[in-house]
């Protein structure tokens, strides 16, 4: 359709007098009809123009539903309706350039490369989703909080920080956002009870501080095909006196690590190892311990999702405030279980892991088992699952099925029933109080978009970090 500006319309109806005289004779247009034509055009043209824009937006929505969001718990009609809501809610922020940041995981790569583009096309908001290291995300949040300057409009931050966010008073609780400045841009189909991990992002005041975006567990990983080989099972029983299988405690894990690294040594012409880990001096070495390694050994009190009063970090907590880490101050960070956990970490890394593991960090080590020379790993993040099922890699069968399996984490000698065992991590949307309201609302729309039911199942299949119960 040809769009005619108001200036062009004026020129078309107010011609030089000589032209008017020549035109009025053959057409005999009365003055009243001329006025009617002008008024009619002033109403019809904007309507037709708006219809054109609406049709264009509908086409964009349909394109994404048909080409990308092909797996969803919603029907196609429900998906279109939800995306139409996003397009309408975003109108006040159309044209804004919004910046959000997260750590680099397969799930967030999909968000950054695909979902940000979809959101931008559907809403008219230019969304930049940056990827960086988790330690850098923490530094950025800390800088915005302490320096009182806005760096980003939204963050995806580990739920481990719930205590810091609650105590700082600098984070805008999601509960307050959806009942306050963000009420008009909160998806009526958000369905909070459907989310996994809300307990992790809820403060002592029972307010939700962060909206879960993805979650993954830390579990035991092993080569099921090797564990089932008759020759290896026979040799293991001859050496250790019991069947080769999934270990339930650290002693059995150490036996299996020794078996593959020291006694088997080589399989199918390749050097193999009974253990994998990482040890480079890096921020990620911190969460190698904070992600419940100490409590797996038994350095915490009974309680879920955290031990109380001593949590899985070995820190004594009272009213959501840390009051002591050392034994002398009521903590467990230097207690027998923690010392044992540190000793096993160093010993196994040196004796049973590939030599290069000592110089690796979290990101570098995560995908190493996919190379096919690792028998087991006691501390493995399911966030790397997507890297472990790619066709053609050594740990995947020709039919696409995995040669590996996951199982619950083995427990250390100090562990008692009722203690936390293993680890679950939630990466969640976090918004600062000192951010601009309009920019924050636009970022809040994007946060809801990437966890919406229209999108979430496809995102789960891409990154394998499910966040909605309905998707599972």
Can you say where each PLM-predicted feature lies in the sequence?
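Short helix-initiation/N-cap motifs at beta->coil->alpha
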Residues: 132-140, 248-252, 356-371
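Hinge/lid segment of periplasmic solute-binding proteins
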Residues: 58-92, 159-219, 403-409
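Extracytoplasmic "Venus flytrap"/periplasmic binding protein-like
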Residues: 114-194, 207, 229-231, 235, ...
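Short, low-complexity disordered leader/linker segments with a strong preference
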Residues: 1-97
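Extracytoplasmic/periplasmic substrate-recognition and gating elements
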Residues: 202, 226, 350-353, 392-471
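Periplasmic solute-binding protein
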Residues: 159-179, 195-242, 254, 277-325, ...
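Short, polar/charged alpha-helical segment
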Residues: 82-89, 106-126, 221, 225
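Glycine-centered hinge/linker elements that transmit conformational signals in sensory
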Residues: 252-261, 296-359, 409
């Amino acid at each position: 359709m040809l769009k005619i500006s108001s200036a062009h319309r004026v020129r078309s109806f107010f011609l030089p007098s000589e032209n008017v005289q020549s035109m009025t004779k053959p057409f005999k247009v009365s003055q009243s009809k001329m006025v009617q034509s002008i008024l009619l055009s002033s109403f019809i043209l904007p309507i037709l123009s708006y219809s054109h824009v609406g049709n264009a937006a509908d086409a964009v929505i349909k394109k994404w539903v048909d080409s990308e969001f092909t797996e969803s718990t919603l029907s196609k009609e429900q998906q279109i309706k939800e995306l139409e809501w996003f397009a309408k809610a975003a109108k006040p922020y159309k044209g804004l350039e919004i910046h959000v940041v997260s750590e680099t995981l397969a799930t967030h790569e999909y968000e950054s490369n695909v979902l940000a583009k979809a959101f931008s096309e559907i809403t008219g908001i230019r969304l930049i989703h940056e990827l960086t290291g988790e330690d850098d995300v923490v530094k950025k949040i800390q800088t915005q909080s302490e320096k009182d300057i806005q760096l980003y409009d939204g963050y995806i931050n580990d739920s481990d920080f719930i205590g810091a966010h609650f105590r700082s008073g600098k984070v805008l609780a999601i509960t307050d956002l959806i009942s306050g400045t963000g009420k008009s841009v909160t998806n009526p189909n958000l369905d909070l009870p459907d989310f996994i991990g809300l307990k992790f992002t809820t403060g002592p005041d029972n307010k939700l501080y962060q909206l879960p975006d993805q979650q993954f567990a830390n579990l035991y990983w092993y080569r099921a095909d090797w564990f089932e080989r008759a020759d290896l099972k026979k040799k293991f029983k001859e050496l250790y006196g019991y069947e080769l299988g999934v270990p339930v405690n650290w002693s059995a894990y150490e036996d299996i690590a020794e078996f593959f690294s020291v006694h088997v040594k080589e399989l199918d012409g390749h050097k193999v190892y009974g253990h994998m880990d990482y040890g480079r001096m890096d921020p990620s070495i911190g969460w190698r311990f904070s992600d419940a390694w100490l409590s797996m050994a038994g350095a915490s009190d009974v309680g879920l999702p955290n031990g109380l009063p001593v949590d899985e970090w070995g820190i004594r907590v009272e009213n959501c405030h840390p009051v002591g880490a050392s034994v002398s101050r009521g903590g467990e960070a230097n207690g027998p279980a923690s010392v044992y956990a540190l000793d096993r970490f160093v010993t196994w890394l040196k004796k049973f892991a590939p030599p290069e593991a000592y110089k690796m960090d979290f990101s570098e080590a995560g995908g190493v088992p996919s190379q096919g020379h690792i028998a087991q790993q006691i501390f493995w993040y399911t966030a790397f699952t997507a890297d472990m099922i790619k066709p053609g890699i050594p740990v995947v069968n020709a039919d696409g099925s995995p040669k590996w399996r996951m199982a619950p984490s083995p427990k250390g000698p100090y562990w008692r029933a009722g203690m936390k065992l293993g680890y679950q991590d939630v990466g969640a949307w976090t918004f600062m109080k000192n951010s601009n309201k309009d920019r924050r609302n636009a970022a809040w729309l994007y946060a809801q978009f990437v966890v919406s039911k229209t999108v979430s199942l496809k995102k789960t299949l891409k990154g394998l970090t499910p966040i909605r119960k309905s998707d599972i």
